[in-house]
Amino acid sequence: MSLQPHGGFLVQAFHPDKEITSIHKEIELDAISLSDLELIAIGGYSPIQGFLTQADYESVVEKSRLVSGIVWSIPITLPVTEEKAATLQPGEEVKLVYQGETFGVIQVADIFEPNKRKEALLVYGTEDLAHPGVHKLHERPAIYVGGKITLIKRLAQKFPTYSFDPVETRQLFASKGWQTIVGFQTRNPVHRAHEYIQKAALETIDGLFLNPLVGETKSDDVSAAIRMESYEILLKNYYPENRVQLGVFPAAMRYAGPREAIFHALVRKNYGCTHFIVGRDHAGVGDYYGTYDAQKIFEQFKEDELGIIPLKFEHSFYCQQCEGMATTKTCPHDSSAHIILSGTKVREMLRNGEVPPSTFSRKEVVDVLIKGMQKEVVK
């Protein structure tokens, strides 16, 4: 499998010396647009070079492809109010501002009103406003601005030790001598089921890139700071140091299930991964998606047009009779012997003051989660 970035090149659009004194118009970004701006500029979203124009947006929504035919499954858009849109013209440069600071510039290509109902149905598979992705879609302004961007100021890194651009992770993997790298996306603390599939992958892959998402998530997700501490202690105690690399993914969570699984895989390809783990209900929320829908969607695309190999794992569990982690492929016992693990269940137990057993998560990880969540409650 090629280590080429998606589309064949790594976008590099960080130019801190760009002259902006003559640019007077500005667009206020929200947290999602801000993280998207940086990820476009550092090549995380290659080959996208800006917020999607109408033609690319409609193609992505309808076909999971850019107009060029390159696979891309999540629309990366810049929403503005109708009032702001009325002041903008195609062809002009506009500053991209967040909380009073200019972070970038967009070369406006077009300004258009999206069909958000269609976007919700095709990208999220539902119009239900209780779905956090659909809710956020409709909460954001009504008009989209498309065009190439330039990043002129980097965001402050919440986790500088673990913050890497795709250029840096590629160099890092090469320096470790890794020929094959498997990416793992998570927004939850790593429980025993995660550990099991990660280590199963490591039996045949050179290195694991544990790449937790630390951008905007649902309010009931465990905070990034607590999760990062739990990842550190898990890797220190239970993983071979020379076979794993921890690095943060500063994107917002979309909760788009199958569509987001493709997106997550393509982004990890840009970071230098050759393989990507897709478990049960990847990027799902509630009961909106089938257990393995996020795996099945990969069958809609040819392996060479994705350029990254999905590793599809069945739902793993702790079997009391096997006395270890297993799946239905490796365990013959009845489901009554199985303890089903999930990030949702771990979160529920912690919030109810219950201590998850060692069959759920390592004791060291549980201790970190309990202490961290108690501190957050005190705040």
From Swiss-Prot:
Family designation: Belongs to the sulfate adenylyltransferase family.
Pfam entry (one): ATP-sulfurylase
Catalytic activity annotation: sulfate + ATP + H(+) = adenosine 5'-phosphosulfate + diphosphate
Gene assigned in the entry: sat
Keywords: ATP-binding, Nucleotide-binding, Nucleotidyltransferase, Transferase
InterPro entries per UniProt: ATP-Sase_PUA-like_dom (IPR025980), PUA-like_sf (IPR015947), Rossmann-like_a/b/a_fold (IPR014729), SO4_adenylyltransferase_pro (IPR020792), Sulfurylase_cat_dom (IPR024951), Sulphate_adenylyltransferase (IPR002650)
GO function terms (MF aspect): ATP binding; sulfate adenylyltransferase (ATP) activity
Xref: HAMAP family: Sulf_adenylyltr (MF_00066)
Protein name as it appears in the record: Sulfate adenylyltransferase
GO BP: hydrogen sulfide biosynthetic process; sulfate assimilation
EC numbers for this chain: 2.7.7.4
PANTHER family on file: PTHR43509, SULFATE ADENYLYLTRANSFERASE (PTHR43509:SF1)
The protein's annotated pathway: Sulfur metabolism; hydrogen sulfide biosynthesis; sulfite from sulfate: step 1/3
